Amino acid sequence: MKRFLTFDELKSLTYEKIEALQNQKFRAFIRYQIYPNHPFYRRLFKEHEVDPFDLKTPADWAKYGLPLVKKADYKGNLREFVLNPQQVDGQDRNPAEVIRNLLDYYKEAGYKDERSFVFRRGLKVKLRVGKEKATQELLDHIKYQYSPRFFWFSSGRASGLPSPVFLTHYDNELMLNNMAKSGKMAIDPFVKDGFELRAMNLFPSAPHLGFFGVDGGLLQMADFVVRSTAGGAISTDKLVQLAELFKVTGFAAMPGYLRNIFCQELVKQKPKLEKRGIILLAGERIYDAVVDNIKDYFAEVGMTETRVIGGWAASETKIGVACQCQEKGGYHNLSPLAFAIRFVKFTDSVGGYEFTSPEEGGYITIFHLDGRSSMFEGYLMGDHVDRVTTGKCPHCGLDMPCFFNISRESEIGAQMQVMGIAEEKIKGATVNLTVLRESLLALSDIHEAQIIVSKSKPDDPYSMDVLSLNIVLKSNTNQTKAQRTIQKLTKMETEITPEIHFMDLDTLLEQAGGLKFQEIVDARVKPS
């Protein structure tokens, strides 16, 4: 069994074979990684009286009555979502049991080389033949697999800090290999003509999957990488100059930044770019009109043959990514051995659900099949797709589901039902608006607060997002001091500098709907 499939291997397999590999990995992962080592799911299985050995495919999650896990569950139990083989039910685990679980996992998953490595060294320890060296090698192996080494952030939580998703060295290895495939998907049609990818990473340098994943993926598969980042130490005008200087043929960015900031500077300076180029977009919903705008801007400066491809991932997917195979097309899961994507619909208002048929679409739910540290099973992402097609893709030849029109549930009440929190993508950052408002109201000087998300150009649905706060202060409050405090808190929790509007309570109540107070408003005009 392979840990990940190369792009060519992925194209050579039928979906029946891919699904069989997924089910094998799912069984092994649930039985010998999740149940023994994951405190949250171990407790969940016990509470619902589910034997992990009964879970043979992701569909069994619904069959045995397990609830979907929501973002609110994770944000309230961060430590319990981290695999910990050294403890079980709060007690230290015998080291021999740790090794036995690992051997069983490798056997069930089909990892022959890894099982042989652990078995031989375990035998040396038992027979006291080269025991010291073998013990150290086992410790190094377990440390590489399980010890958290870094994190990136999901959205904010009640403590006022964003929620970290932890990764190990092992996770990083999987992530780098899987992320590179999205780039290879993008350049695949150009490869036969000798296309040389000289890429520029325009994602903001921050502890997020968007930067780490893109940066690592580009380093794996590009001929040259300009690791420049957007909105950082290098100004946009200098980034455009670097693109011309290094003959960049590939740009990776969030669509809002690329269209509204970088491309505006591009057409202003009019550098001479290469004729053929690749543009990778992620981090925000990708609208067809934005793709057309971006292509037109690049055509103005000589890049007349562009291929614009979108990617989908999230902090919690960690080690995997889905990607379009053609402009304005659907998305394929390019990491099917890392995580499985399934789609659900809700059957009642208290969490009842069922898996949907392909033509129905539904809410994206993920099941990790590999990885360490923070892990998620039956995890509701909050993103919705309109439809899913199956069979061999007529565009790229992949024989696997293709899902279309990814969108975030925008109605606040529906979000609370789906995810247990209200989140929005604002300037590419996932912002927990529910927690932000709670944090604002916890400030001693604030009496009431309303959050509004809008557009910098109200009539342009593709213009930059704006986060506005309508604030009512308590009497005798220093407004200047309060403004600094609010800006600092909001920047820390959301990475966004807000527009702050102070007003009296009567004015706010009138604007916010009177008795039916609208605490959070998404006023962004939607594309027609």
Name every feature range the model reports, one short phrase each:
Residues 97, 102-103, 203, 228-229, ...:
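Glycine- and other small-residue-rich loops at beta-strand/loop junctions that grip anionic moieties
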Residues 172, 204-208, 256:
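Short glycine-enriched loops at secondary-structure junctions
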Residues 137-142, 204-205, 238-240, 265-268:
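Catalytic micro-motifs at enzyme active sites that drive phosphoryl/nucleotidyl and oxygen chemistry
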Residues 182-221:
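Conserved AMP-binding loop of ANL adenylate-forming enzymes
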Residues 135-140, 160-169, 196-203, 226-227, ...:
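Short acidic, glycine/Ser/Thr-rich loop/turn "cap" segments at secondary-structure junctions
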Residues 175-198, 235-247:
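Conserved ATP-dependent adenylate/AMP-binding module captured primarily in the ANL superfamily
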Residues 1-154, 160-181, 245, 465-470, ...:
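Nucleotide 5′-phosphate-binding alpha/beta core
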Residues 1-40, 198, 223-528:
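Active-site glycine/GP-rich loop and adjacent strand/helix microenvironment
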